[in-house]
UniProtKB/Swiss-Prot annotation:
GO biological process: photorespiration; reductive pentose-phosphate cycle
Key word Chaperone present: no
CDD domains named among the record's database cross-references: RuBisCO_large_I
The species this protein was found in: Nolana spathulata (Chilean bell flower)
Keywords from the UniProt entry: Calvin cycle, Carbon dioxide fixation, Chloroplast, Disulfide bond, Lyase, Magnesium, Metal-binding, Methylation, Monooxygenase, Oxidoreductase, Photorespiration, Photosynthesis, Plastid
Miscellaneous comment: The basic functional RuBisCO is composed of a large chain homodimer in a 'head-to-tail' conformation. In form I RuBisCO this homodimer is arranged in a barrel-like tetramer with the small subunits forming a tetrameric 'cap' on each end of the 'barrel'.
NCBIfam families to which the protein is assigned, alphabetical: PRK04208.1
Protein name: Ribulose bisphosphate carboxylase large chain
Amino acid sequence: SVGFKAGVKEYKLTYYTPEYQTKDTDILAAFRVTPQPGVPPEEAGAAVAAESSTGTWTTVWTDGLTSLDRYKGRCYRIERVVGEKDQYIAYVAYPLDLFEEGSVTNMFTSIVGNVFGFKALRALRLEDLRIPPAYVKTFQGPPHGIQVERDKLNKYGRPLLGCTIKPKLGLSAKNYGRAVYECLRGGLDFTKDDENVNSQPFMRWRDRFLFCAEALYKAQAETGEIKGHYLNATAGTCEEMIKRAVFARELGVPIVMHDYLTGGFTANTSLAHYCRDNGLLLHIHRAMHAVIDRQKNHGIHFRVLAKALRMSGGDHIHSGTVVGKLEGERDITLGFVDLLRDDFVEQDRSRGIYFTQDWVSLPGVLPVASGGIHVWHMPALTEIFGDDSVLQFGGGTLGHPWGNAPGAVANRVALEACVKARNEGRDLAQEGNQIIREACKWSPELAAACEVWKEIVFNFAAVDVLDK
């Protein structure tokens, strides 16, 4: 009979459509689905498509007032995950009209909203998203991108060097500024506010901005190189955040910083727009990411958070080190490093990339390697990340036995030695330690650093690894 028929019907009758041909304008998602016992995978995949688009738990008569065929998400393919019991990859296609233009916030509210608390699923993880060019073009993206940043800084042909000022909390503004000066004077390109430095009683933001700007200009004058300090503009309200960014611009500094996950995508996109309009570079820290991305069966993979950041806007983002103290398997890390930097990335399941991604003209983001790295890691980092990256040594600079400036000198000498060796055709993976030892002969600072950190390793297996 025609007309409204009340009652509950299975999701898969409406939302599981294996015959569907995906459109170029669809947003495609790959979900790792772990259904509850007794729930067939088709029903679980269809439930994800329904609950993250037009569906609800029962038939409603207002369905008759719209075209569900036009607006519904569709689960169009399901694959069993090899080597895992009761895990499936469900592919879902979303029509573009479901999403507001230029809003990462709206995209995530749909795709990773209520559906993650759905009772029929034991666990759910968003592994990857394909953002169609039609949607990419509605975003400004990074304020400047890799090439414009190099032109602003006049630094080419090598990775950039940074350092997070430690201890991260407790220093006064003047002492903080002094540490910034010493690191920049020693040869680093950037120093960085820690992500939790905002405006606390021991150091208010305005005092920190002033002393850091003074340090920066002094180091610039003495070295003849352009220097930067990531001034953390993250604040409790968007208005306060923009106020801090305005003050940074008035001081004439080149770069500010934001914690994009704790601050939120709306705040981040607002700041990115301000930065492009006012010539500021934007460094992004990913505090809170491991809460979301570290478990293999539930949450959102970091490659999705990285894509979202490229859309929302940021010129640098922390992306793991492969060799330091923080999580990150090599192939997975290189997969999302490519997604940050390149214009076009082919599907490659061996690196965890589920979809071919075309960024059209969206600028690239520099990946930042940071966390437990020191001079002995320099050859590996140079080889893994290449020139378009920022290598950040916090303890690896400030922990030098002779002080901050010699720590910076050691890092700069090690980097220049690795870049020179690579350009001469030497194999950094095989000869790395030899290259560093040779450089020690003419740099006592580097020799001292090598002696201190020769035994330090962080040998733990990664939690989030590729499927077999």
